[in-house]
């Protein structure tokens, strides 16, 4: 028998591979497993996430459900045992329904059903592993939302069983094989970014690039790529980088955003040669508008917004398209005054009303806005649009190469038309792809709505893709720079996963993040060490075993310690376990309440024991007054769908819950941490201090590491 697995399948056939490894480890057979870097093994078969080829058979069996049933038929002693086959296969059916289900309500009902079934059971059927267990485990593992929900602890019995399954050799081997296969696939594909892509007509020492943010929000990571790319080419050709604020819309802009953008640019390590403002050129731009009208290339129009949108869509000329030049000039004068007549009008470029490219259908180039400008006050009442102002200021400031994201592709002909119409100096437009991420909104309008509706705490919310948001979540500036540079100046439009983003950060923080200990305070178990120290005492231990430069921390030892409920649940009578950073101990007594929860333990130290021989290495904390209350906060993405399609409203895909709090007791060293310090809480992950200990508690935010599974199972 041989098994083939599609690495990119949704869902991935973890259960079938675990069964194959279970057979191999048991000695009942020898099954080869082949991993293919595809979404489907057979493009015509939507169920072909896995296939089984039986010896002597001409055609393979496709799909997780049929694969599990095949294992049960070929190896009944292993996967059915003494149990009722129909009962085992009914759970395989349930697993099939679970694997691809992302409906939150239906999923919750299924998980509750599984949890209830396990109240008095260790396994789904009988007293030994069956294909029922492997199928349910595989379904949970492949369904990120389901696996994440289990890890929240809401489904206590299911979480206990899931942890047990993760400890099985067949499962461990399966996950190691998948990780290895994925890494090999990535390595084969990765050739690194090509920074040898040059700019057209670039002359060393003469290249001028510009990064033109609008001061209407905070920089997000997409802007960061644009800024770093402009700096890259300016440096490559020993030229000049301009940071220019496109500040021609008083309705959206303010000095707070402007100052924040400058701070973020500095944090990114970007040093512009000059900072400029489009608003400094408003008089010059206005004169270009006058000249456009005089040359018959622009006209005043009072068509209402809805009618104009309809006419542009249908290719219908405005009734004012042939308005006399003098009349248009008079109306522009009224717009400059902000009069009633001026407010009803705009100025449109006279290009074409039926061009296949709708961006070219007589776009608006000037409009009124009576709101005070954050730099010029009420001096101006009419302002140019970005499409009109940008080529003018680019030309005036000597820009040689305008780097624009591919989303502007339809507007690039408009940019070139403006240059030609106003006899401006030639400027090269060079395209690059913007960075898009799964389950992430980068639209400034949508991000503003989310802030305004109170769905997040602000623009620096750790769930936000802003530079400030990812920094607050624990992304280092060094890692952010490395990641963006690693993407290269590609023009390929990709939707990126956050995995590599945070994995880059982990490489930076892991060698320097001090290690600390914490145990969940909910249902925490007190363990008495019968041969423990008579009185608590402290010893110096390294803050990071592989980095002595970080110094030492105080570790407190006592005869009463705290252990997490999940760890206590896994203990067996007289089992030898390892208390991390102390030594081995025997479990001499386990006390439970009526619900099955462990209420207390008695341990006996065995410090001469070999930690390499113990199955369980657990964290613990001395139950003394020095233990520190901490709120560990984890987050999920704001939307549930990887990529929103055209016309889809993000409000229909908001994640039900995106903020999760876990109260813990941590070691005394937490009290000395400052805001922004990054640590690793052993067996829990990396964290950044958001609120230092204030006498009551500290608040730490989880830092994704590219491997951990977040709430609802989302990989960050």
UniProtKB/Swiss-Prot annotation:
The keyword Thylakoid does not apply. It comes from the Eukaryota. Its EC number is 6.1.1.17. Keywords: Aminoacyl-tRNA synthetase, ATP-binding, Cytoplasm, Ligase, Nucleotide-binding, Nucleus, Phosphoprotein, Protein biosynthesis. GO terms for biological process: cytoplasmic translation; glutamyl-tRNA aminoacylation. One of its GO terms (cellular component) is nucleus. Pfam families: tRNA-synt_1c (PF00749), tRNA-synt_1c_C (PF03950), tRNA-synt_1c_C2 (PF20974). It is found in: Cytoplasm; Nucleus. A motif ('HIGH' region) lies at residues 215-224. L-glutamate binds at residues 210-212, 246, 386-390, 404. It is an enzyme of class 6 (ligase). The modification Phosphoserine is found at residue 190. ATP binds at residues 220, 407, 441-445. Belongs to the class-I aminoacyl-tRNA synthetase family. Glutamate--tRNA ligase type 2 subfamily. Catalyzes the attachment of glutamate to tRNA(Glu) in a two-step reaction: glutamate is first activated by ATP to form Glu-AMP and then transferred to the acceptor end of tRNA(Glu). This is Probable glutamate--tRNA ligase, cytoplasmic. It comes from Schizosaccharomyces pombe (strain 972 / ATCC 24843).
């Amino acid at each position: 028998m041989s098994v083939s697995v599609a690495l990119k399948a949704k869902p991935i056939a973890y259960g079938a591979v675990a069964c194959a490894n279970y057979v191999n480890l048991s000695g009942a057979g020898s099954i080869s497993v082949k991993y293919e870097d595809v979404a489907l093994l057979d493009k015509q078969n939507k169920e072909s996430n896995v296939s089984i080829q039986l010896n002597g058979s001409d055609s393979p069996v496709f799909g997780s459900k049929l694969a599990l049933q095949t294992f049960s038929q070929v190896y009944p002693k292993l996967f059915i045992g003494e149990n009722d086959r129909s009962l085992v296969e009914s759970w395989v059916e349930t697993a099939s329904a679970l694997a691809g289900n992302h409906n939150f309500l239906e999923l919750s009902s299924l998980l509750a059903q599984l949890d209830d079934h396990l109240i008095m059971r260790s396994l789904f059927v009988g007293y030994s592993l069956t294909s029922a267990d492997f199928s349910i485990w595989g379904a949970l593992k492949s369904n990120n939302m389901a696996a994440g929900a289990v890890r929240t602890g809401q489904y206590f019995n299911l979480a206990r069983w899931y942890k047990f399954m993760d400890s099985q050799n067949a499962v461990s081997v399966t996950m190691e094989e998948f990780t290895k296969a994925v890494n090999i696939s990535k390595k084969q594909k990765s050739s690194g970014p090509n920074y040898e892509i040059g700019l057209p007509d670039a002359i060393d020492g003469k290249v001028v690039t510009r990064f033109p943010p609008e001061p209407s929000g905070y920089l997000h990571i997409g802007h960061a790529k644009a800024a770093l790319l402009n700096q890259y080419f300016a440096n490559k050709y020993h030229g000049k980088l301009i940071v220019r604020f496109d500040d021609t819309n008083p309705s959206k802009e303010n000095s707070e955003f402007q100052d924040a953008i400058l701070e973020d640019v500095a944090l990114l390590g970007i040093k512009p040669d000059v900072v400029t403002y489009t608003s400094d050129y408003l008089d010059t731009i206005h004169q270009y508008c006058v000249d456009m009208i005089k040359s018959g290339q622009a006209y005043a129009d009072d068509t209402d917004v809805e009618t104009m949108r309809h006419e542009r869509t249908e290719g219908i000329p405005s009734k004012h398209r042939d308005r006399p030049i003098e009349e248009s000039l008079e109306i522009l004068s009224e717009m400059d005054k902000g009069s009633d007549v001026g407010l009803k009008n705009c100025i449109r470029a006279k290009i074409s009303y039926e061009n296949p490219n709708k961006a070219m259908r007589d776009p608006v180039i000037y409009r009124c806005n009576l709101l005070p400008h954050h730099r010029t006050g009420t001096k101006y009442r009419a302002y140019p649009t970005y499409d009109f102002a940008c080529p003018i200021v680019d030309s005036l400031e000597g820009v040689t190469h305008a780097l624009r994201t591919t989303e502007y592709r339809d507007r690039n002909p408009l940019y070139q038309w403006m240059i030609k119409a106003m006899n401006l100096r030639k400027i090269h437009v060079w395209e690059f792809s913007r960075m898009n991420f799964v389950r992430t909104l980068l639209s400034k309008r949508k991000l503003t709505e989310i802030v305004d509706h109170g769905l997040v705490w602000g623009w620096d919310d750790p769930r936000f893709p802003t530079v400030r948001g990812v920094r607050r979540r624990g992304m280092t500036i060094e890692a952010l720079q490395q990641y963006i540079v690693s993407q290269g100046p590609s023009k390929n439009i990709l939707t990126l996963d956050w995995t590599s983003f945070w994995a880059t950060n982990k490489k930076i923080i892991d060698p320097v993040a001090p290690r600390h200990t914490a145990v969940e305070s909910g249902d925490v178990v007190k363990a008495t060490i019968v041969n423990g120290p008579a009185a608590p005492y402290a010893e110096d231990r390294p803050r990071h075993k592989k980095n002595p430069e970080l110094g030492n921390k105080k570790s407190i030892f006592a005869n009463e310690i705290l252990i997490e409920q999940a760890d206590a649940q896994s203990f067996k009578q007289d089992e030898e376990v390892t208390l991390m950073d102390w030594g081995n101990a025997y479990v001499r007594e386990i006390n439970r309440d009526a619900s099955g929860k462990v209420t207390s333990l008695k341990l006996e130290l065995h410090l001469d024991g070999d930690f390499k021989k113990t199955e369980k290495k657990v964290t613990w904390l001395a139950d003394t007054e020095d233990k520190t209350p901490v709120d560990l906060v984890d987050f999920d993405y704001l939307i549930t769908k990887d990529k929103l399609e055209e016309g889809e409203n993000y409000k229909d895909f908001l994640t039900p819950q995106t903020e999760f709090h876990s109260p813990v007791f941590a070691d005394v060293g937490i009290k000395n941490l400052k805001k922004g310090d990054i640590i690793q809480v052993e067996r829990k992950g990396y964290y950044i201090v958001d609120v230092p200990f204030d006498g009551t508690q500290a608040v730490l935010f989880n830092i994704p590491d590219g491997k951990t599974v977040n709430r609802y199972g989302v990989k960050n």
